[in-house]
Every structure is written in C-alpha cells, then in structure tokens.
Amino acid sequence: MPALAQPGQRQTLKQAPVAPPSPPFLQWFASFLRQELKPYPGRAVLALRYTVAATITMLLIVTFRLPGAAVGGFFSLLLSREALITTLRGGISTIASFLCGTAFLLIGAILLVDYPLTHFLWVILSFFVAFYGLSAMSNYGAGTAFAIVIVLSVPAWDQAGPQAARVVANLWVLGSVALAVTVTIVVEFAFSLFDTRDELTEGLDQRLEAVRVVLKQSARRAVSPEAMGKLAQFAMIGVSRLRRLALRPNPARQDTARLSTTVSLAGRLVDILAPFRRFDTLTPHDAPRLQAMADQISKLQRKLHARNDKQVIQPLRTPSDGPLILLGLEQTLDLLRMSLSPAPDQSFALDQINPAPPTILKPDAFHNPEHLNFALRGCLASTLCYFLFNAIFWPGLNTSLFTCVVTAVTSIGSSRQRQLMRFSGALLGGVVLGIGSQVLILPMLDTIAGFTVMFAAVTVVAAWFLTSSQRLSYFGSQLALAFYLIQLHGPSPQTNLTIARDNIMGIMLGLVMMWLVFETLGSEPAVQVMRELFAENLHLMAEYARPWPQGKPADLRKIRTLREKISENFLAVNSQADAVLFEIGRARDQSLAVRNRLRAWQPQLRSLFLLEVALLQYRLQVSPRDLPASIVRAGTHFDNEVCAVLEGIARAFRLADRSCKPHDIQMAYADLEHAILDAYHNQPPPRSRAVLEISAQIIELACRLLAEINAAPFSGAPPIRK
C-alpha cells in the first residue's frame, strides 16, 4: 500500500510552523492600517462603483426631497458587489425584508399605540422580533434591513401628530431604500458591461504569484523587500472576499466546495510564508526544494486558468525532514494540488444532492436556543436605550437603537470589533467630516454641484475603507452613515450642529448599553467560539463519514444539511479569527496563539471534508446491489473507521485525549483494497481506483491532523463546552 507509507512517516512530524509572537496591540494596529489601506488591483474601480451609486442616490433623493435620505444612501453602500447576480438578489432581499419589517411595524402600531401599556409592550415586542430576525434569517443583509426598519421607526410613533402622517413617513423611507437599491443594481449592471474579469481566478493567481516569486528569490538567496511587502499585504487582506466569490454558483468553474478549499489553501500558503523572515537559516541544500515548489506553483497557475485541462499534476517528491517552514509549505502545496488537479475519474461534485432551495429563515430558527438568547439580549439593550432617552426627553438619541442593531454579534471579540469600528467611524464621519464640513465648507456652498463634490469626496474615503478586508470594511460603512445622518437629515444641507451632537451621543449610549448587556450576560471570547466551531465541525464530519443507505430522500436531505452546516462553520471560524485580533487583555497572546493553530489546521480540515464529499459521491452513485458483497462490507467498515478517527481527533482536540490510533483505519483500508482487487481480479475499473485513491488521501490527512493536534495540545486553554 504505497499510498499509506506517507501518512505513517508524517505522523511524527513536528507542529507546522507557527507565526512568531504577536507585537503589542498599538504597534500591530498601526501596521494593520498601513497594510489594509494599500491599493490592490481592482480596488479603485470597486471604490468608484460604491461612490457613483451613493452619489446618484443622494442626487435623486435630495432633488425630489424624499424623507429617509440618510437610510437610502447607507443602503446603497450596504449591498454586495461580488457579482451582478448577488447584487440583484441582495437588493430584492433587502426590499422584501424592509417591506416585511414595515408591514409588521405598521400593523402593530395601528393596533397598539393608542394605550400606554400596550404601546410599551409593542415597543418591547418590536425590538425582540427585530433581533430575532437578525439572528434567525439566513441572509444577514436581509436580517439587518428587517431590524433597521423596525428600530428606526419605533421612536417615530412616540411623537404627537396624526397617524396618517407617520404611516406616510414610514412608507417614504421604504421608497428611499427601494430607490437606492435600484440605482445600485443599475450602476453595477453598467460597470459589468466593461469589466469582464474573473475576480476569483485573478485573486488566486495573484496570491500564488506572490508566493512563487518569494520562493524563487529565496532559492537564489536574494529575497527583495518588494516581494515580501506584496506577500504581507495579501496576508493582511486575507481571502474572505475570495471565499464569498467561491460560494457563488458558476457552471463554468468547479463546484463551490472544491473552490472554497482552493481559496483556503492559497490563503494558507500566504499565511505560512508572509511572517517568515529567517531566510538566512535556509541552506544551499534547500534551494532545490524551494525552486521545485516555485515550479509546482507555476503549474498550478496554468491549471487554474485552463479550466478544461485534464492533465494531472504529479506530486512533488520531497524528503520527510528539513526546516519546518519547508515542510509546512510542501504539505499545503500538495493539498492545493489535490484540490486543483484531482486524479482521473475523481469527482468532487455531489450531483445527486441538489442545492437546497433558498429559505428566509435558517433551518434551526425555531429550535436553536442561541437565537432566543441573542434576541433577548438585543431587546434588553435596545429597551434600556429607549427608556433612557425618553426618560430624559432627548429624542435625538434614537440613533442608539441603530447602534444596537449594527454592533450586535454573538461573541465578545466580534462585538468589540464592531463597537470600536462604530465609534471610530462615527468620530471621523460625524465629528471630523460632518461637523467640520458644516462649519468650514457648507457656508461657502450655494449650489447642488458643490454639495455633490463634497458628498462624493467623503464617500470616496468611506468606499476605500469599505474595500478593505472584513476586519476594516465595517469602519467605512459607519463613517459614511455618520456623515449621511448629518448632511442628509433633511431636504437641504444641514448647518444645525445639534444634529451631529445628538448622533454622537446616541452612538455612545448604544455602545455603552451593548457593552453592559452583551459582555456581561454570557457572550464568549471569539477564540472560544472558534474552538467550539472547529470541534463541532469535527463531529459533523464524523457523522458525514458514516455509512449512508442508498437512495433514501431523507438521507439525502440530511447529507445536504450536514454539508451546508459544515461549510457555514468553516466561514464562521474565519470570521471569528478576525475578531480575535480586536480582543485585549492579559489573555490576548494566548488567544492569538490558539488562533494561529486553528488557522493552520483549518485548510487541512477543509481538504479532508472535500475528500469526504468525493468519496460519498461514489458511494451514492452505485447501488450496493450492483457491487460484490465483499466490497460493500469492506466499504462500510472503512466508512465506520473514518467516522471513528474523526471522533478521535475531536476528543484529542477537546480533551487532549491521545487514545486514538490510526492502526484500525489503515487495516480497514487494507481490507477494502484487498476486496476490490480480489473482486476485479487485480484490474479494478477507474471508479474503484478513484475510491482507493481518495480513501488513501483521507487516511493521510486524518493521520497528519491527528499527529499535529496531539503534538500541540491547548495547554491552559479553557475547556470547550459540550
């Protein structure tokens, strides 16, 4: 069994290279800003698209004096720009959610606001429904729109005046949002006529090229600062945008599971090499290995562009020892080769499991207690804000409710990150740019043309931040929102400084309440959420690996649900990894160390899942009745052993339990190989050879991951909840 020789050797490898100790927070944050704000290919055009859409929306709303101008301008920046189809779907979802929120609000208001007790209960119920929708809706953008329309409209019903006027005001806000969505879709369509680039392929190629250049230069012992700087920028930007692009259905490319794995592995290559600075420790004997890896990346780049190329790229022949940096790069590069260049007859698309139809709510919307806990905490924070600004008769503080919505997340790190970005965005957009323009610029403007130039200039700044990675893009949206709330408060430019004061104080009130409620009532540190998600994925993958009966619709639905949940957890782990960077305190260094380890294991787990998907496809495409009984028994035994190994890895990760040994799964593979060769007289068909190849790769990855987790237990880390 040559395929199993490699796992046995690599089990004894040391932990893959880990990033060096992190610098102090302020030093890291300064470097973070420098890297995030550097230009990259396509960034200027993307920022221009944001600016054009927001500016046209502003001109139409101001020209026709529509209420809700600030909300309309904000939603022109909120829609996704990943592709025209995603913008269209996001726009439709936003309008539908806004319409549902408006209908819920108006029905409740008309029925309940006339009596003080029912009015107060209606306010609490509205806040609860808003936050429950934010947590339980499958589309986060739609959930945000649903929650925003409720929390923005509730305070309006506390004011005196005829009901008809308040109903009309709510409907005008809906009209402003619909106008902003329409303008954004039209602008994206216009730009799509001139931009035919494949952003996903281009982004992957740029990252692979940056790694290839550094490897080639290090083989010659002459690494340039420019090459390392470009690599560091890609490491700082991350691959979150590429992950979202990979999830976009496109029949011209590979399936989304394989593309997501490719993106993760390309990002891992960058993450391994970017922090490395000790090139002087590499000897001349390492130069051939470095050059071989650079050549392998060139082949992978050609494979990436030649989508219909059936040529299989052969693995590198590398020694099993040497510097840890080289071992980590070679392992990741081999996983990338498996993802981009699968063996003949090896498919990764599970054709029998069609994508689930899009649903408004998440599958666990009504039985996951986390949604209820989240809604209760969000409702409490919003109710406290509402009670306070009504008690002191300061209605201008109602922006605190908006702050509660846009900073509400489930973990401390993510919440802290959003609160920091919300406050700093409001400070720059509201105080510096908003009040500054009111005092210094607006008195000199007397035409819409001058106001448009000022508006576009501020939007360009916000759009540049918006085109950063997810760690900083939120700051751009909050900068724009704070500026829009001041300058688009009425049908004409505002010179009243009390508007800016009220907005800033409202934001502060919302941040204080969110801190009190979310960080004192059970929110977990982001690194703890990362660990729980990673462990949950191990258990879900173990369940996915177990034998499945053939052809039962209930089983197919269960498989589809498992796939979707595992993919969601992969994305959530990466999102929480970004949030860990914003956690402070004595445990920050330990949290960053845990984060680095999880990010190192994440691509391996993704690759293992990809192989599970491929293996299950072969199981489902052939009826057990059409196979020899010996192969069916051996295949079932092997699937059970894969399930057992993954559960063993989960125990090793959760409890530092090192009792799991790979001997049983290797014996199960030997039985499967013997059954196939014996049944087909040593000439198995291509499908059976592919099953053996995938099974061997699963063993290799599982053994490697188990060895690395056993070699690096989380000493001193808090236990994971069961």
Residues covered by each model-derived region:
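Hydrophobic alpha-helical transmembrane segments corresponding to the first two to three helices
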Residues: 418-422
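C-terminal functional regions that serve as terminal interaction/effector modules
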Residues: 439-443, 448-449, 456-461, 468-495, ...
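Membrane interface segments of multi-pass transport proteins and intramembrane proteases
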Residues: 107, 111-121, 443-449
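Long, hydrophobic alpha-helical segments that serve as membrane-spanning/inserting helices
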Residues: 2-47, 51, 59, 63, ...
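Alpha-helical transmembrane segments of multi-pass membrane proteins
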Residues: 75-76, 375-387, 397-408, 423-435, ...
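Pore- and pathway-forming membrane helices of multi-pass small-molecule/ion transporters and channels
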Residues: 23-32, 48-88, 98-103, 120-189, ...
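C-terminal structured interaction module
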Residues: 413, 423-431, 714-722
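Juxtamembrane or sensor-core-proximal signal-transducing alpha helices
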Residues: 184-196, 516-527
